[in-house]
């Protein structure tokens, strides 16, 4: 199908039109909620810049967490149900391979649609802004690294990864303390344990390179202290549980001892984290509860280590003669009583870590769309200015018919469950507004016949092929790794 | 770039207001997730849900069904984002304290997810991890409000 009629009135149903920009969990959960809850008939279109759907579920979630990707089943059921031209109340279309702001302008959507919802997530990187961060071999942002091993077509065959000498990577530094930092630690420290990775949908190209790295030591470096770590207990527990493979976690006693934390001052999740760490730091046989003694370390003992390292500020990335990273200079920090952070840059407090690979995992940054300033759409630091999901103009007024949901609404924080909740709340407001608003006086449709794009049917073909390739390689899925392969995947069957 | 692609369809120009008509639509299978078995006579177990608006629904179900399956099979507002694999907190329920102790204790993975649940209470559990059994026949569970904490008064 090459023509998407945005305003659909063929079957006597006057549907209000909604366009959603982005097909990750926030975009799809917003669509799902609208289609499930709206009392008035809707025609919902999801626009996606890649030829394939699901955003961070496909390209962000770690390959060894397939259960987290199960939300894709909900999205698929939803898309299948409302894509078919039956006597459905609502209609749904997926349009892939089109960037709003490029092939189609945001202004055109705003002129055409009864509501537009921006759910395009956080597409930039927060930076350290220190010497050596750019242009040094072996220094990557977490977004680049995660996209690479997840087979994102922008990075899967990037020479910065494929030409890098992985056989020299023994010591790794990861800057940051969120779940992404822990995912990356897990990938790197268990890189040679095939039973974890070989059957997943990890990019085979990336896995083969990662396997070459004799990783022995991964340091997770944070500016603040143990209390301020952002990761969740599930991800931390997964790291501790790697001890059955001879992989041991460490925290220096100056940063962590159970007695430092009065349980009455902290919430349940934090107190559980304290117990987990204090138990796992004990030798296996000295632990008090059986759930910390599920699988003993191998008789050969531990030969790989990950470490939570706190109160450091990275100052400079140092290179060898070939332009590759060889060390990281840092200083100690002081955390003042008012929670402000003070880097101590005097000579006594400066140290150097030898590292062969450095990943900066400082969080994803929201980026405004190119038309925002022209259309006077407000943007606050790293997310779209909004009031409960209704987008604000740069002067703080409500921008009519425009909404935001997910990470681009609030910043890059929270798991899929919280994104889902956010999408539902924004969806409710869109419905509230649509029920009382009049329809557009001018009705337009956007002709896509001259713009290359994919439909839901196209994605079904690509999906089928990837699953088939996966079956042959004994993987859950073998993703197409380039745009060319993805577009070719549309053909046939 | 694509301005020339905008096409105004003249036949559509006449319609200026939206009429909100409720047509006889086909029943959507999309809204029916679960497939629940019908309990054999004499073996029915009862469960009561307290919904977000305070109303109550009681169902007769089979042994072994999870609370998530039961809720989805009856189109209640409960998501199972991870498909019931204990990897998210979207099927969070608050169990009537009278029944809470009759449940097997939560495992670490369930507790790790409950850490992230909205409106967590002392008797919170994940719906996907509770299977119906004779021990909990008659159990009452509340679906949490997202905007406020649910407390034990919701059961009185």
From Swiss-Prot, chain A:
Topology in membrane: Peripheral membrane protein
Residues binding FAD: 26, 48, 56, 100, 407, 414-416
Entries under InterPro entries matching the protein: FAD/NAD-bd_sf, Ferredox_Rdtase, Ferredox_Rdtase_adrenod
Any GO BP annotation: ubiquinone biosynthetic process
Catalytic activity field: 2 reduced [adrenodoxin] + NADP(+) + H(+) = 2 oxidized [adrenodoxin] + NADPH
Molecular function in Gene Ontology: ferredoxin-NADP+ reductase activity; oxidoreductase activity
GO cellular component terms given for this protein: mitochondrial inner membrane; mitochondrion
Domain of life: Eukaryota
Effect of deleting the gene: Lethality in aerobic growth conditions and also during fermentation.
Keywords: Electron transport, FAD, Flavoprotein, Membrane, Mitochondrion, Mitochondrion inner membrane, NADP, Oxidoreductase, Transit peptide, Transport
Gene3D superfamilies linked to this entry: FAD/NAD(P)-binding domain, NAD(P)-binding Rossmann-like Domain
SUPFAM superfamilies per UniProt: Nucleotide-binding domain
Compartments reported by the entry: Mitochondrion inner membrane
Binding site for NADP(+): 177-180, 223-224, 235, 414
Record bears the keyword Disulfide bond: no
Pfam families, per database record: NAD_binding_8 (PF13450)
EC number from the UniProt entry: 1.18.1.6
Swiss-Prot/TrEMBL cofactor(s): FAD
Entry function: Adrenodoxin reductase transfers electrons from NADPH to adrenodoxin, which is involved in heme A biosynthesis and in iron-sulfur cluster assembly. Involved in the electron transfer to heme A synthase COX15, a heme protein that catalyzes the conversion of heme O to heme A. Required for the de novo synthesis of Fe-S clusters on iron sulfur cluster assembly protein ISU1. Involved in electron delivery for Fe-S cluster synthesis. Essential for coenzyme Q biosynthesis. May be involved in the electron transfer required for the hydroxylation reaction performed by COQ6.
Additional remarks: Present with 1600 molecules/cell in log phase SD medium.
Family classification: Belongs to the ferredoxin--NADP reductase type 1 family.
Alphabetized PANTHER family for the sequence: GLUTAMATE SYNTHASE 1 [NADH], CHLOROPLASTIC-LIKE
Protein name: Probable NADPH:adrenodoxin oxidoreductase, mitochondrial
Gene from which this protein is expressed: ARH1
